[in-house]
Amino acid sequence: MASSMLSSAAVVTSPAQATMVAPFTGLKSSAAFPVTRKTNKDITSIASNGGRVSCMKVWPPIGKKKFETLSYLPDLSDVELAKEVDYLLRNKWIPCVEFELEHGFVYREHGNTPGYYDGRYWTMWKLPLFGCTDSAQVLKEVEECKKEYPGAFIRIIGFDNTRQVQCISFIAYKPPSFTEA
């Protein structure tokens, strides 16, 4: 018992603890930092990207159908679709092919609550492609879906089964009868 008391007393009086870093004493005064205030109330002077501020046009809300991710771009070619699917697979997301026969875009039919839209849920083509490692497999399923339903909109989604969320969704095919108007 005496030896255990002796060793604990030796630890408490150790000179190594006396040389530890000083405790935190607080932040330095902000008086050392210069404060500049602009008196100009012009809205263009508020935002800055390091150069001259220029305004961008907004997406026209009338006559343009909104689809999924990348809907503002021209239709994707087969090579571009393969690259998107490769990206999906690199992120370890599960690819899934879905189709919609009537509306390939969000619309309002049953609800008028802000933020509520119909047309978000599409019909799944077969099962999700669990274990898929090649974009050619996914594009083959898209082609099969096109043959079965030539008048359908087809999209590819990427599902993260760890977080249980849909991470990406993009249109893979629009029917020939569809017009953008």
UniProtKB/Swiss-Prot annotation:
CDD domains: RuBisCO_small
InterPro entries: RuBisCO_ssu, RuBisCO_ssu_dom, RuBisCO_ssu_N, RuBisCO_ssu_sf
Highest rank taxon of the organism: Eukaryota
Subcellular localization: Plastid, Chloroplast
Transit peptide segment: 1-54
SUPFAM superfamilies tied to this protein: RuBisCO, small subunit
Pfam families reported for this sequence: RbcS, RuBisCO_small
Keywords assigned: Calvin cycle, Carbon dioxide fixation, Chloroplast, Photorespiration, Photosynthesis, Plastid, Transit peptide
Further remarks about this protein from its record: There are four genes coding for RBS in Arabidopsis thaliana.
Function: RuBisCO catalyzes two reactions: the carboxylation of D-ribulose 1,5-bisphosphate, the primary event in carbon dioxide fixation, as well as the oxidative fragmentation of the pentose substrate. Both reactions occur simultaneously and in competition at the same active site. Although the small subunit is not catalytic it is essential for maximal activity.
Protein name, per record: Ribulose bisphosphate carboxylase small subunit 3B, chloroplastic
